[in-house]
Amino acid sequence: MLLQFSTSNFRSIKDEVTLSMVANSEVKEHEDWLCRAGSENLLSVAAIYGANAAGKSNILNAMAVAIKLIRYSDLRGINNTLPEIAPFLFDEEMHTQPTRFDFIFVYKGKKYQYGFAADRRMIIEEYLYVYEASKPTKIFERQDMNQYSFPADKEKRFNEYAEKNTPNKLFLATATSWNCAETKEPYMWFAEAIDVYDFEQIRSEGLGIIEEADQGLKEFLLKTLKDSDFNITGYTFEVMPVIVEDLKQSGMPDAIAELLRRQATEGEGKRYKIAARHVIKTKAGSRHFELPLQEESSGTEQIFFGIALIKRAMESEKTIIIDELSAGLHPLLLQAIIKMFYDKELNKTNAQLIFSTHDISFLSLELFRKDQIYFMEKDNSVGTSTLYSLDDFSPSPVRKDNVRDSYLQGRYGAIPIISLGETIW
């Protein structure tokens, strides 16, 4: 479970911003929505609000970039650069400074802190700590690219791993690839227990989950679709062979069609045929019709694949992060998804959901605690984005019945400044 993520010098984020999933003990409302990790109460859901281009996506992208760099570090060639690193552009001094990422998390009952700093050429700093008690214990530290510090009882063994590492690779990944027990579980948290999604990634992973779905997932998916008033009573799912001539006739360029055929032959590419079953009343009575999923609304597609993803997360104590979760979804559907994470019968493993949105229709203290609501605001005069929580405001301007109205009135910032008085239509 994620406790905290911090980043700096990434895209519009110049100075360090922190997203905390640790519940504020002074917020007493909806304590039954919290999940427990050791001695800490954690949020199961966090929402990030803000205007368009305020930087909401950038903090989520920072997490995505860090996770990608960790997962694929060991595949990086010695001469490969780190093009994913994107420093703040509107200050020339920041171009020469590293981008920083820091995670605090709990995995398999242990609390860890892992972070690194990198530019587009190499890893500048890196560290991993484990909390055996209330204070962190060093597993390793790395400074100035290749200056390592290890506990005395691990120094000889860890130095052997360090000799196998390169300046553009993360020691966490390199040591794990050589079966280092101390780094394996922290690495596996990044490999398996946290993911950042946009719609295409939801669709891609959802397809794989549905392809392997057991009866329990199928029943859960259909019940959710029915409860959400989609009038879908079933679905069919087929994996189709890739036939080049069919792809060419559909208008796909020959080269791409041939590439898909080769991928399918090698077990990498697949075509899926999914249809949703509807019951429609006709003059002759009720009839069953099947509609290809791609002809359903984007919201139907998103909920179809998204529910599969969420169910899998709830079975595996996963933290899922979704950019613009509300896109294409009715607010009531989004509320239902959020409430799934609060439901202890459904969310038995304490899965977490973090998402960005600018849909204020469900911005309410009936659906969120104060410490679950974050705002991202951009100062366009200098190009910097900052992140802060509704919980940072004193109690007086935060009333249970007017959070949405107060936000629209600008009391919490993070709204667009619109001036159309001189506009000629």
Language model region names:
Residues 1-38, 42-71, 281-415:
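Switch/communication elements of ASCE P-loop NTPase nucleotide-binding domains
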Residues 5, 101-103, 123-130, 273-282, ...:
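Short polybasic amphipathic segments
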Residues 8, 203-295, 411-412, 416-423:
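Extended helical coiled-coil dimerization/tether regions that scaffold
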Residues 13-15, 108-112, 122, 134-136, ...:
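Short acidic/polar mixed-charge low-complexity motifs
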Residues 36-47, 51, 60-113, 119-123:
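Conserved P-loop NTP-binding catalytic core
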Residues 60-98, 168-225, 339-353, 358-362:
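An exposure/low-complexity boundary signal
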Residues 113-252:
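Electropositive, glycine-dotted interaction segments
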Residues 160, 263-264, 363-364:
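Short proline/glycine-enriched turn/loop segments at secondary-structure junctions
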